[in-house]
Swiss-Prot record:
Entry's Gene Ontology cellular component terms: cortical endoplasmic reticulum; endoplasmic reticulum; nuclear outer membrane-endoplasmic reticulum membrane network; oligosaccharyltransferase complex
Subunit note: Component of the oligosaccharyltransferase (OST) complex.
Membrane-spanning segments: 425-444
Protein known as: Dolichyl-diphosphooligosaccharide--protein glycosyltransferase subunit 1
Membrane topology, from the record: Single-pass type I membrane protein
Leader sequence segment: 1-18
Disulfide cysteine pairs (residue numbers): none
Location in the cell: Endoplasmic reticulum membrane
């Protein structure tokens, strides 16, 4: 019966019996619920108990009901946290390559970071305008792995110490979890085999009365101007609030009166941008038009922009706005071997959230050739087009990239751009302008000359 069970597990998970050579000597899971989506860090000490070197470890990323994996990255501690690219087998199953292969009896420490979406939900789903919000999260007590695990610890970090309910256990006479402030720690020395189906359950309900912003759409356009030495940037964002919805209609009078004593609220009432220090010509618009409810503060190293929407964005509501500005080319550019190099942030929009769909459009100066762009995110679609602006002759190349489910941290990543610039396009434009002026003067002379 045990052999049949092992064979069935092998078929389901895609593992053969010959690959059951790993053992998890220690597993530490850290689940961070302080962000707008769930961040996990799993530290695994794996030991090769086989007779041959192994170069692949199969990992199951645990998710709660309705939760999906947005991103997953792996580093190896023994190799100075060198990264390795996990290979996705199916929804939550990944093969982690190990180079050099792990010899029999040797161990490796894997550090696995993941971003998860859909596991946290408000309960109740609707609240009053000035009522506290409670969120719930569900996970397993033990690591879900096809291999045997000896020691393990699950650590939940919550936004505050206001924890309403959480699951308790008594394991080997020890009361779990150990609670310190906003942290719950479940620790077990019980050996769990890969065939164990009962992984336990951890349920936690906690108070967190803040908005849960999410970017439904992000569009970034950057125009590069060689002759003006400027970058023109435009960011259009559609925000959604995934917090608890309003139980009744919005009371504007109560909202404005509440601003005098700063009550807790699940509404988004401001968005903060950090721009380069020499940014100028900043303007902020939405679907209606220009908005004056914004504040700009210039500091030595950066410029802060605080945007205030026309209305508070409560749970289930959305808001579209666009921010445009200009900044000096030279702050991002360097030249080498007749090539121009630009290191530009992926986006300036606020991080700590998910962007369901993101599009980047890079408009190069006329005369740019041999263009190379290195994007720091996985691209789902890309294309190259050509446009003509005022007095253009050759046209400008536009590189457009699209990505799905871009997560926090990524907006601070860097896009590496390089190209060769032929200044003859600029002089051709001057020649055209000069020729037009001469023709215009000649025509005026022929018309008005006696």
């Amino acid at each position: 019966m045990l052999v049949l069970k092992l064979l069935l597990w092998s078929i389901i998970s895609g593992l053969s019996l010959a690959e059951q050579v790993w053992r998890n000597s220690n597993a530490i899971r850290t689940i961070d619920l302080r962000s707008t989506y769930t961040k996990t860090l799993t530290s695994l000490i794996i030991v090769n108990e086989g007779d041959e070197p192994q170069n692949t470890y199969r990992y199951f990323q645990q998710t709660s009901p309705g939760e999906s994996v947005l991103s997953l990255s792996v580093s190896i501690k023994e190799e100075e946290k060198k990264g390795t690219n996990p290979i996705k087998v199916n929804n939550n199953v990944y093969d982690i390559p190990l180079q050099p292969p792990v010899k029999p009896g040797e161990s490796r420490t894997l550090l696995i970071q993941a971003g998860l979406d859909g596991g946290v939900r408000p309960l109740p789903a609707a609240v009053d305008q000035d009522e506290e919000q409670y969120l719930v999260y569900l996970t397993t007590l033990y690591l879900d792995s096809p291999y045997t695990t000896d020691l393990q610890r699950t650590r939940l970090i919550l936004p505050s110490a206001k924890i309403d309910t959480y699951t308790t256990y008594n394991i080997d006479g020890a009361e779990l979890p150990n609670r310190v402030g906003n942290t719950l720690v479940y620790e077990s020395r019980e050996t769990i085999t890969g065939e164990d189906n009962d992984l336990g359950e951890i349920y936690v309900r906690y108070e967190h009365t803040v908005p849960i912003p999410r970017g439904a759409d992000l569009y970034v356009q950057i125009d590069m101007h060689e002759y003006r030495k400027m970058l023109e940037v435009s960011e259009r964002v559609v925000f959604e609030n995934h917090a608890a919805k309003l139980k009744s209609n919005f009371d504007r009078a109560k909202w404005y009166m509440g601003n005098f004593y700063n009550p807790v609220s699940t509404a988004i009432n401001r968005v903060v941008y950090s721009l380069p220090r020499n940014s100028k010509d900043v303007y902020y618009t939405d679907e209606v038009g220009n908005i004056t409810t914004s504040h700009m503060r210039v500091e030595p190293h950066q410029t802060w922009i605080e945007l205030n929407p026309r209305y508070p964005v409560f749970g289930g509501w959305n808001y579209l706005f666009q921010l445009d500005w200009k900044m000096p080319y030279e702050e991002f550019r360097s030249s080498k071997n007749r090539r121009e190099y630009l290191d530009i942030p992926l986006a300036w929009s606020p991080g700590d959230m998910i962007y369901e769909k993101a599009v980047w459009s890079y408009v190069f100066p006329e005369g740019a050739t041999n263009i190379e762009i290195e994007m720091p995110v996985e691209i789902s679609n890309s294309n190259v087009t050509k446009i003509h602006k005022f007095l253009d002759t050759l046209g400008r190349q536009v590189f457009t990239y699209e990505a799905l489910n871009v997560t926090d941290g990524v907006p601070s990543d860097i896009v590496h751009i390089s190209y060769e610039y032929n200044s003859s396009a600029f002089f051709l434009r001057i020649a055209i302008i000069t020729t037009l002026l001469i023709l215009l003067a000649a025509a005026a002379y022929m018309i008005w000359a006696p």
